[in-house]
Curated annotation (Swiss-Prot):
GO molecular function list: FMN binding; isopentenyl-diphosphate delta-isomerase activity; magnesium ion binding; NADPH binding; oxidoreductase activity
Pfam name, any one: FMN_dh
Residues binding FMN: T62, G63, M64, T65, S93, N122, K189, S214, T219, G272, I273, R274, A293, L294
Binding, Mg(2+): E158
Function according to Swiss-Prot or TrEMBL: Involved in the biosynthesis of isoprenoids. Catalyzes the 1,3-allylic rearrangement of the homoallylic substrate isopentenyl (IPP) to its allylic isomer, dimethylallyl diphosphate (DMAPP).
Cofactors, names only: FMN; NADPH; Mg(2+)
Organism of this sequence: Ignicoccus hospitalis (strain KIN4/I / DSM 18386 / JCM 14125)
Keyword Magnesium (UniProt): yes
Entry binding sites for substrate: R6, K7, S93, Q94, R95, Q157
Principal location class: cytoplasm
EC category name: isomerase
Protein name, as recorded: Isopentenyl-diphosphate delta-isomerase
Subunit structure, as described in the record: Homooctamer. Dimer of tetramers.
């Protein structure tokens, strides 16, 4: 199937169907309340700098869409709002536009509507193993004048696509050839199944300095592919996708894994971040930045004001969360999370708990 048509399928399904599965485990994260915060709420600072761009809060809309007219309209709405609020955004995979230049405008519109915002380009890891190199990466970056590029990992999703790219052999070698040659920072981004300690450590050793965990508990791209398989009459593939739709590392655990493996890296918490409390807990776990996708996509589909209301609510939640923990700025809330139940058991069984304590 042509890439742009597949992306249209994905957009339609994520907007209309129940595509969430798994559990973020953020319910097993507690952040102690500071009864005497010794702060003035109005003086709490939420601004941070990421890739040379100042953000008014540690919050971005992570990439989900592009490559067709409907996606372009959504990207335009998101771009206008993040520009107005001083936030950032990523676009969905740009493969379709790299291969068909007439689709570039569906992504470029993001920079046109957000001339000053942090923008993150996006290409898939499997394409790097099928011939993509510096030329295609540069094309994706230049297309939206991006400040960074996400290389997304989606082995789980690809496993359930009849046309899926399931050869990941040699990816580390390929990335090692590119990491020092790409002009902009590279973000390694999962897509709903979470980043693990071993992968992050290996990637950090290559020189990668930014990771978007995109853990389980939010949008399940396996579940999205389940709907596509049903529509095509492939009941075997649909059944297996249904069984495995909750596959992945819960977002809270993935934040801990990434932070333990790469104490000095930028860690973006995403995957099932649905409200401001989730954002505060993610920052307390050790994330530098919080990413939202599906709720922002659905709000943008309703219109600019709906998205603005959602993002402003997230921003205010973060500010109040910092205040209530005695944290004058985002970096001060790191290390204040207490992890309980299966999340702590996971960290102990995985042998990352002590490293996480030191790194957060």
């Amino acid at each position: 199937m042509e890439t742009s048509n597949r992306k249209l399928d994905h957009l339609r399904i994520t907007l209309l169907e129940d595509v969430e599965a798994g559990d973020t485990w953020l319910d097993f994260v507690k952040v102690p309340h500071r009864a005497v915060p010794e702060l003035n709420l109005e003086e709490v600072v939420t601004e941070i700098e990421v890739f040379g761009k100042k953000l008014s809060a540690p919050l971005i809309v992570t990439g989900m869409t592009g490559g067709n007219e409907h996606a372009a309209k959504i990207n335009a709405v998101i771009a206008e709002v993040v520009e107005e609020l001083g936030l950032g955004m990523g676009v969905g995979s740009q493969r379709a536009a790299v291969e068909r230049p007439e689709l570039e405008w569906t992504f470029r519109i993001a920079r046109e509507r957000a001339p000053n915002a942090l923008l993150i380009a996006n290409l898939g890891a499997p394409q790097l193993l099928k011939g993509y190199g510096l030329e295609e990466i540069k094309k994706a970056i230049d297309m939206i004048d991006a400040d960074a590029i996400a290389i997304h990992l989606n082995a789980a999703q690809e496993s359930f696509q009849p046309e899926g790219d399931v050869d990941y052999k040699g990816l580390l070698n390929k990335l090692s050839e590119l990491v020092d040659k790409v002009e902009k920072p590279i973000i390694i981004k999962e897509t709903g199944a979470g980043l693990d300690y071993e992968s992050v450590k290996a990637l950090r050793e290559l020189g990668i300095k930014a990771f978007d965990v995109s853990g389980s508990g939010g949008t399940s791209w396996v579940r999205v592919e389940m709907y596509r398989a049903r529509e095509k009459g492939d009941e075997v593939l649909a059944t297996v996708a249904d069984w495995m739709s909750s596959w992945g590392i819960p977002t809270a655990a993935s934040i801990m894994e990434a932070r333990a493996a790469a104490p000095d890296a930028l860690v973006i918490a995403s995957g099932g971040i649905r409200d401001g409390l989730h954002a505060v807990k993610s920052l307390a776990l050790g994330a530098d930045l919080v990413g939202v996708a599906l709720p922002a996509l659905k709000a943008a589909y309703e219109g600019k004001e709906e998205l603005k209301k959602f993002l402003k609510s997230m921003m205010l939640s973060i500010k109040i969360g910092l205040f209530l923990t005695g944290s004058p700025a985002p970096e001060h809330i790191k290390g204040k999370a207490i992890v309980l139940g299966p999340l702590k058991e996971w960290a102990l069984e995985r042998g990352i708990y002590e490293e996480w304590l030191r790194a957060r």
